Every structure is written in C-alpha cells, then in structure tokens.
Amino acid sequence: MPQKLYIETFGCQMNEYDSAKMRDLLEVSDSFELARSPEEADVLLLNTCSIRDKAQEKVFSQLGRWRPIKLRRPEVVIGVGGCVASQEGEALQKRAPYVDIVFGPQTLHRLPSMLEQVRCERRPVVDVSFPAIEKFDALPEPRADGPKAFVSVMEGCGKYCTFCVVPYTRGEEISRPVDDVIAEIVALAEQGVREVNLLGQNVNAYRGVLADGGMADLALLMHYVAAVDGIDRIRFTTSHPVEFSDALIEAFRDIPQLVSHLHLPVQSGSDRILRLMKRGHTRAEYMAKVAKLREIRPDLSLSSDFIVGFPGETDEDFEDTMALIEQLGFDQSFSFIFSARPGTPAAAMADDVPPETKRARLARLQAKIADNAAKIGASMVGSIQSVLVEGTSRKNFNELSGRTENNRVVNFAGHPRLIGQFVDVVITESLPNSLRGRLIGVAHESDFISPDSTAQIA
C-alpha cells in the first residue's frame, strides 16, 4: 500500500514550486501519495518562509500541532525545509527533537535519501548546505497541475538589502541553463500548460548558459519561452528594479505572450529610506523605468511590495510612499510592517517607529491600494477580457474561474470542459477581490466558438 505524504507550505511562489517538487520526488522514488490530513500521513513536511514577522514562532507552533501525531505514531517522519530551516539548521532540531529531517531550499532533491537514512539509522538528518545547481539536475520530470505552472529559472540573490534574509537562506544567484528551462516548459506545454510564471528571488538577474557556451539574460530567455508551442502567456517574478534592463523593457514590446502586468517591488517611495534599505536605486529611477514600460504598454498594471515603519521612517518618508502609489497607480501589493530578521543589517538599526504608527500607516497604505484596485476594476466593467480558465470557482462549484492578463480573478458561468482554455468574457461586475463576467466566446486553436458550441470542446 502506498505511503502517505502531507506537505504544509508557508510563504512565496518559490516555496509552492519547491513543495510541488518534493511531492514529485517522493511519488517517483518511494511511491508516495498525498494525504488529505496530517493525521493520516506517514511523512509530514513543513516548507517554511522567513520573510514575515515571527516566522520562527509560526514554524514551531505548527510543529507543536504535529507533535501529538509523532507521540502516537513514532514511526511518522517529520521534516522541515525552506528558509527557516536554512537559518536555524541544527538549532531547529535541538529545539524540536521530534523533528527527523532538516533541509534547506538547495537540498530538497536529497529528500528520498535523507528519508531512507532516517529510517535505516534511526537518527535525525540535517542538511542545509548550498550545492549550487545540483538541486535542479536531480529533480524529476515536470508534472502539470492545471493550465498554468511555475518554473524556477534561478535562485538566490546577491543584492543584500538590509532587511532581507534571502541571500543568507537561499544563497547567491544561481541560474539554470537555458536548455534545461526550455525542456521543462516544453514538457509542461505537452501536458496542457498554457501559462508559465518564471520564478527567481531576483529573476531579472537571470544569466543562463546557452548550448553554444554563450549567456542569455531574462529577456532572451523569454524569447525562447515564447517560441514553445502552446505557451500563450508568460509572467515572471520577483523583479528587482536595478536589474530591470532596457532589453527587458523592450521584451514587453517584442513578445506578445508577455502579459501586461508586472510585479516590481519598490518597498518605499522615500529616497532616504531606499538608501537605508540598500536598494541601489532612487525613486526617480524607479519611476523612469515604469514610464518607459508604459510607453510600450499603456495598459500595464503594476503591483509592488511595501515595507512600512522601517527604522527611521518619518511621516515625510511615508508620505513619499503614498505619493508614489498615487502617481503610479499600484493596484495590488504585498505590504507589511517592518520586523527585524535575525542576522540582517536592519536588525541592528534602532526600531524607533512606534507600533501604533506602523499599524496606522499600513492601514492607510492598504486602503489606498484597495481604492486604486476598485477604480481599475470598475473601469473594466463592460470590457471584453481574455481569460485563462483555471478551474471551478472556490465559492461556487457551478461556476468557472480564471485570470485576466492583468492578473484579475474572474468568475463566470461555463462548462467544465472549458478548463485549460482561453475564453472571451465580458466583465459585468467589479467586486473587492474579483470580477464577475459573462462568457461570450471561446478561442480554440485560433477559431472563435460561440458559448452555444462549448459542448463540442473535449
């Protein structure tokens, strides 16, 4: 009988990608199948994130919930991976001695052998090393899970922003060879994937080796991706403004598959705070890049990351951020109150912004983003949008759900056979977190099919 695997994932899209690879590795090597709950699992894996406040506490809280399972069934193996595991290493296992495996983002490919070692030797295994590109060489064949997929093209970051742990937990920048990336995307396209999201902690810094020994940047890589049969949409994340080159801007002009949506973290609109964060760019430089992009793609939607209450942030600094949001019209964001990450330079700075001030600033910022989003959503009502149908609606299984090019969720009535297809939907209503629409046609192999004909689609 197959063993059961349960994976809990905290954090970013890269962690989601890594968790999917853990699942694939163990399904291939040890014939595991996914458990519906931790209680029925033989192996419990926690893939952790160290970006947000109290990341360690969240990890140990989750492990505490799993501890009774281990006490009842000592043969259950508990593993902790991801960035907190990389930070804590052996200290994590000492604090939670019932944890059997501690592994970093760059050693997840060793999970099958670590699992075998734990079971044979009956002692914990800790491996948080950084074995460069080896991780990608050892991963199983890609497996599609719906019409869109994440594809990791590089890992790590060498920017060392003062608030960020990524260089310490994911290591320096490592790019996959171009042929390896394209082979993975071809395999996914053959399984029905229509949209790929190219991932990296600093994806703009991609420098992959070509078959002839040359080097490809992200712009060139996306030209190769666009040539893959079946891939109709390309996204990429996460970007650093410093690495956003003219070649990358020109890719928005030359590659129609590249969507008119960009996540470009700025963190703050204050030059003084940007210097303290060691971001390497100014407010004006950031705005100039966005202006160039919007000359090429006037309908480009923009999302960002913001940190409020960074050490030393004054009212004036915060107002600079609010003004930037107003000027550039960000309509989506990941925004957080500053919390010091252990071992980073910002952790040594005086955290002198009162908690109540931080909370008030965050509330104002998020309200402004929500207001921008509402205005853009309202402006889309009556428009016809191309939507990639991802599945059924989370709130109504009788409806379908998909995303527009500008990353808006749209729910509408339609036949489940449309999942995985691009459809044309007229937007009828804008809601706080989604849009509602009416199906008006299906784009299928370059033909237009009316809604009455959707039963013909296999």
Curated annotation (Swiss-Prot):
Residue ranges occupied by any Radical SAM core domain in the UniProt entry:
143-375
The protein's required cofactors? [4Fe-4S] cluster
Q: Which domain of life is it from?
A: Bacteria
Q: Which family does the record assign?
A: Belongs to the methylthiotransferase family. MiaB subfamily.
MTTase N-terminal domain residues: 3-120
**What functional role does this protein have?**
Catalyzes the methylthiolation of N6-(dimethylallyl)adenosine (i(6)A), leading to the formation of 2-methylthio-N6-(dimethylallyl)adenosine (ms(2)i(6)A) at position 37 in tRNAs that read codons beginning with uridine.
Compartmental location: Cytoplasm
Catalysed reaction, written as an equation: N(6)-dimethylallyladenosine(37) in tRNA + (sulfur carrier)-SH + AH2 + 2 S-adenosyl-L-methionine = 2-methylsulfanyl-N(6)-dimethylallyladenosine(37) in tRNA + (sulfur carrier)-H + 5'-deoxyadenosine + L-methionine + A + S-adenosyl-L-homocysteine + 2 H(+)
For this entry, the protein name equals tRNA-2-methylthio-N(6)-dimethylallyladenosine synthase
Q: Which CDD domains match?
A: Radical_SAM
Task: Name the keywords, alphabetized.
Answer: 4Fe-4S, Cytoplasm, Iron, Iron-sulfur, Metal-binding, S-adenosyl-L-methionine, Transferase, tRNA processing
Query: Which positions bind [4Fe-4S] cluster 2?
Result: 157, 161, 164
Q: Which PANTHER family does the protein's record reference?
A: CDK5 REGULATORY SUBUNIT-ASSOCIATED PROTEIN 1, MITOCHONDRIAL TRNA METHYLTHIOTRANSFERASE CDK5RAP1
Q: Enumerate the spans annotated as TRAM domain.
A: 378-441
MF terms per GO, please? 4 iron, 4 sulfur cluster binding; metal ion binding; N6-isopentenyladenosine methylthiotransferase activity
Q: How does it assemble?
A: Monomer.
Which SMART domains did the record assign? Answer: Elp3
Enzyme Commission designation: 2.8.4.3
| Cofactor binding remark | Binds 2 [4Fe-4S] clusters. One cluster is coordinated with 3 cysteines and an exchangeable S-adenosyl-L-methionine.
Q: Which residues bind [4Fe-4S] cluster 1?
A: 12, 49, 83
Q: Name one GO cellular component term.
A: cytosol
